[in-house]
């Protein structure tokens, strides 16, 4: 027996530890490997580079509204394939696949509840549902949110994350742009605040309608916001676009949005703004939502 064989015979292999799927994830921006549970506590914000990852509609609403106050609205509304539309796949099959993947019936979730004790109606897009595209049910649920806000005489907040109108519903999808905008006119007539929060991405027919009609238009950092995508624009105008074009930082420089707010600071910022607009006492900044960790912004100078 050679010396190599003698060494190999004395080596006892260790049993490989199995790590359950979903325990770890990687930041899309900096590549840092992150503990999934910690990332969720940080509201899907990377603690290393402050990259704001996409967040599910329900997690967003649960992180915004007071615990125990949430009541879902419009959950009975379901999409129908009235046009029998088919591209490379039947629309009804796309719907079934998206519903199975996300657990949602459509791309918009609406809830009413309280924010620091203040009544509010909130809506959030589920981007994982067909790219957060707007169809008839999305429009109907948004109008339901407006009607509930009018009934309760309270503010409305909408978190947009959408690729635009849903092509599989053709003109019925485009009609939602006018339908939702007309509903918001009633909020304006009543003098009730509507705050639009633009997250990554907010594009197409959604950005061209209710997403940009807020009394305040707030964006998350580095969110892509626009109508057509940058690649489409470059191919059309045959010019190179400026760095950061259509990102929230670019838009605030041009006056297209009102402010940029980090996600961990969004809840208190919205509560403070709405309390002022509704002539209510300011929320207590020393009473953060239970279970939510508010990570500080990374020190950009130290990273450089």
UniProtKB/Swiss-Prot annotation:
Q: Where in the cell is it found?
A: Cytoplasm
Which terms in the Gene Ontology molecular function aspect does this entry carry? acetyl-CoA carboxylase activity; ATP binding; carboxyl- or carbamoyltransferase activity; zinc ion binding
Q: What is its main location?
A: cytoplasm
PROSITE patterns from the UniProt entry? COA_CT_NTER (PS50980)
Q: Which residues form a coiled coil?
A: none
Known cofactor(s)? Zn(2+)
Q: Does the keyword Cytoplasm apply?
A: yes
The cofactor note reads: Binds 1 zinc ion per subunit.
According to the UniProt record, what class of enzyme is this?
Answer: transferase
Known pathway: Lipid metabolism; malonyl-CoA biosynthesis; malonyl-CoA from acetyl-CoA: step 1/1
Which residues are noted in the entry as Zn(2+)-binding? 27, 30, 46, 49
Catalyzed reactions: N(6)-carboxybiotinyl-L-lysyl-[protein] + acetyl-CoA = N(6)-biotinyl-L-lysyl-[protein] + malonyl-CoA
Gene Ontology BP terms: fatty acid biosynthetic process; malonyl-CoA biosynthetic process; negative regulation of translation
Q: Where is the CoA carboxyltransferase N-terminal domain?
A: 23-292
Q: Which InterPro entries match?
A: AcCoA_carboxyl_beta, Acetyl_CoA_COase_Trfase_b_su, ClpP/crotonase-like_dom_sf, COA_CT_N, Znf-ACC
Question: What are the start-end ranges of the zinc fingers (C4-type)?
Answer: 27-49
- Residues of the region (Disordered) are 283-304
Any idea of its EC number? Answer: 2.1.3.15
Q: Which NCBIfam families match?
A: accD
**Subunit info?**
Acetyl-CoA carboxylase is a heterohexamer composed of biotin carboxyl carrier protein (AccB), biotin carboxylase (AccC) and two subunits each of ACCase subunit alpha (AccA) and ACCase subunit beta (AccD).
Q: Which family does it belong to?
A: Belongs to the AccD/PCCB family.
Q: Describe the task this protein carries out.
A: Component of the acetyl coenzyme A carboxylase (ACC) complex. Biotin carboxylase (BC) catalyzes the carboxylation of biotin on its carrier protein (BCCP) and then the CO(2) group is transferred by the transcarboxylase to acetyl-CoA to form malonyl-CoA.
Name of the molecule in the record: Acetyl-coenzyme A carboxylase carboxyl transferase subunit beta
Q: Which species does the entry assign this protein to? A: Salmonella typhimurium (strain LT2 / SGSC1412 / ATCC 700720)
Question: Gene name on record?
Answer: accD
């Amino acid at each position: 027996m050679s010396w190599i064989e003698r060494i190999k015979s004395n080596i006892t292999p260790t049993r490989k530890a199995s790590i359950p799927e979903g325990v770890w994830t990687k930041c899309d921006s900096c590549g840092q490997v992150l503990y999934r549970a910690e990332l969720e506590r940080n509201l899907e914000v990377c603690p290393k580079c402050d990259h704001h990852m996409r967040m599910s509609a329900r997690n967003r609403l649960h992180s915004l509204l007071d615990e125990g106050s949430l009541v879902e609205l419009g959950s009975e509304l379901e999409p129908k394939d009235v046009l029998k539309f088919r591209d490379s796949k039947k629309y009804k099959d796309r719907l079934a696949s998206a519903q199975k993947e996300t657990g949602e019936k459509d791309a918009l979730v609406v809830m009413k509840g309280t924010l620091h004790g203040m009544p509010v109606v909130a809506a959030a897009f589920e981007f994982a549902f067909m790219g957060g595209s707007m169809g008839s049910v999305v429009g109907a649920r948004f109008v339901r949110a407006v009607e509930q806000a009018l009934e309760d005489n309270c503010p409305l907040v909408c978190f947009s994350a959408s690729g635009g109108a849903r092509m599989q519903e053709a003109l019925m999808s485009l009609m939602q742009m006018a339908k939702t905008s007309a509903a918001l006119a009633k909020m304006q007539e009543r003098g009730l605040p509507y705050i639009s929060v633009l997250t990554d991405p907010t594009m197409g027919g959604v950005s061209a309608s209710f997403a940009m009609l807020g009394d305040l238009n707030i964006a998350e950092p580095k969110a892509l916001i626009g109508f057509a995508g940058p690649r489409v624009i470059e191919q059309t105008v045959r010019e190179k676009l400026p760095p950061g074009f259509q990102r929230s930082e670019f838009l605030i420089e041009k006056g297209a949005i009102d402010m940029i707010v980090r996600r961990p600071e969004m809840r208190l910022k919205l509560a403070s703004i709405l309390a002022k607009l509704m002539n209510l006492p300011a929320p207590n900044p020393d009473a953060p939502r239970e279970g939510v960790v508010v990570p500080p912004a990374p020190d950009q100078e130290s990273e450089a």
